Amino acid sequence: MSSEKQFEFTKENIDLYLKEVAKEYRKQAGKKMPAELVLIGGASVLINYGFRNMTTDIDALIQAASAMKEAINHVGDRYGLPNGWLNADFTNTDSYSVKLSQFSVYYKTYANIVTIRTVAAEYLIAMKLRSGRQYKSDLSDVLGILAEHEKRGTPIAMEQIRKAVIDLYGGWESLPETSQAFIENVMEDGRFEELYEQTASGEKEVGALLVQFEEKYPNVVTGKNVNEIAGNLQKKTDRASILAKLRERKTEVEQKAPKQERDAPER
């Protein structure tokens, strides 16, 4: 993580840059070399939903001729975009699955040669849960997706999420225990929009604490320990984690239920 200001991709400029990449790719590869990009993560969220304003890079599965790399770099140079602005680095992370393309949906075709696809809703949720980073937007994205589908009248059921996790990763137990507990609790609670605001705020707080930690202890944080460190930093804040709040609320409801049964008049 870095405290330096990062480039922000929005729904509007993502479309512009992808269109320019397609045009450049067609110039270099010709008309007979079709390509496909499956947008993952924040880019997929931006394109399909309105609750998130930006992402700092564009992750994608890239199926194309070698000219695609040059096209991406050319567009990046032209618009002053950061190195790796469009990349497939996520294929080296735990959230990657070889089956992602199978569960993608059509978005657009540019220059009659580059097809853009995104990840279907419940599979995007599965990816976010698999990653489960407390210092990024993973868990708030899950809640945002659930909230928007509820508003659209196309709510996502727990069974759909379980199936998506199994389809991509082979089993429910493939998720981190914190992600399992998180999704089970929020699905039972159902206040997706309210929980989204709380979770997004908590993620920003933990992210800021992690930046401070890295400045104080350089070269300590790695890809393997970052989630553990972020979790410990979250516990040290005054704000209780959203998961802790959900568990507390669930306990209160369970404690009230027996009392209500005892107080109920006999018939």
Q: Language model features by range: what are they?
A:
Residues 1-243, 263-267:
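Compositionally biased terminal segments of proteins
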Residues 255-261:
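Intrinsically disordered, low-complexity terminal tails
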